Amino acid sequence: MLKPSDLDPKSLRLQATRRARNALERDFIAREVEQRMAERLDLIRHVPTIIADIGCGRAAGQPALSARYAQATYLGFDLSAAALRHAQHASAPASMLARAGRWLSQAGGVLTGLRGAAPVAGGAPIFVAADTHKLPLRNSSVDLIWSNLAWHGFVDPLAVVAEWHRVVRPEGLLMFSAFGVDSLRDLLGPQAELVSFPDMHDIGDALVHAGFAEPVMDAERMNLGYRRAEDLIAELRAALGGNALTGRRRSLLGRAVYRRWIDALESRRSADGLIPVVLEIIQGHAWCPSRKRLPEGLSPVTFTPRAVRSGTAPILPPRE
């Protein structure tokens, strides 16, 4: 069963900002999983007009999504405004970047404004610094929710799933990926106090409970090998971040501790000269029913008048 995590939101935001500086240099894991997600889109008939990318970071996947769905408006949401500035710079002309800079620096007002209006289909990508637990979108305003390897940074996964259901339109699609429970299980070292990863069955149950239909969940192992322990650490930090637990040790990791970590990884080097790492990658998608459940668990009820026979009128009970 999914439960709220012990993650510190402030620490998550600071780590995301630090990773934004060099995320693209160590982005192999996210890009590989993203490509696998895109292959699944080839099998799904869906034509969105509004796409919400949750936890987009520097939005390296935005060009591919926008190319696939040229008619759609792309909305990228992330905790880090710094990451989104990189995304805006990479995807828009300088004139749009200047406007976006002022926009992001006044995030509070913009987010309040977005709650009152749905985005317009088509046009340039839009990037918004926002809490993924409270998206600045009105109800039933998005056709496709896309989230690539962002799950481990959700403080309250159940609240995020409920928010996804709130903003998705009837017959809209949710597609996401996440690190699974078996990720890094065999990785030893002083940083073993990593955030616990979800079980795919628990995610499926949460989707159904929130109101999504026909969830399809799959898990596969990604076997990686690194020649240098330092590269392994750098790539995992780019994909996962550091220790953001509320009860984490606040002091810096000393050189001696870091050296012991490197030595522990080196001791795991296999016969082919590589240090192995195993990640469990969960991929899932689900649909929002055409008759979408309302907030507070309510469901819409439609009353259809009984067919009127030819030449007769419906019989109504007499008024008292």
How would you describe each model-predicted region?
Residues 158-173:
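A short glycine-rich, Lys/Arg-flanked "PGG" loop and its adjoining helix->strand segment in the class I
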Residues 171-231, 238-255:
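Conserved catalytic/acceptor-binding region of the Class I
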